Amino acid sequence: MQDLWRLKVDWDESLPLNINTKWKQYESELPALREITILRRAIILEEHISLQLHGFADASESAYGACIYLRTTDVDGMHSCRLLCSKNRIAPLKGLSIPRLELCAALLLAQLTDKVMKCLKVTINSIHLWTDSTIVLAWLQSVSRT
């Protein structure tokens, strides 16, 4: 859709060949999504001695996103991880650098973590938020100039 906006294609115009080809490819792959299952039910029992949140943020030229997993440990030392939630955004039409998009992903992760913490009715032992961007880590640790 962003490509259509960039090219200023009107609603009654035919799609350019390259976009039409991409759309047909996407459409043909949709049925394969029925085969994907992700266990999302997070069961928290009294036997769990440790509850951790692990959040991940990442970005590309076209989008950025964040996801949060709940990692539980029971009395026998058995670990379990379940996806709690995720959120993504399409990169703005105004071109942003990859480091800036990575920073947007880190902000999205922080906001998502805040919402999750408000919803959970249990004590979380530790929270770990991850990014692969060393630039973002440096920005987050720097002193604000304002």
Report residues per predicted region.
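Beta-sheet entry/capping signal
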Residues: 52-54, 63, 82, 104, ...
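RNase H catalytic domain
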Residues: 108-146
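Acidic, metal-ligating active-site segments
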Residues: 55-81
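Secondary-structure capping and boundary motifs in well-ordered enzyme cores
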Residues: 45-52, 56-61, 97-102
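A short, polar/acidic, helix/strand-boundary loop motif
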Residues: 72-104, 142
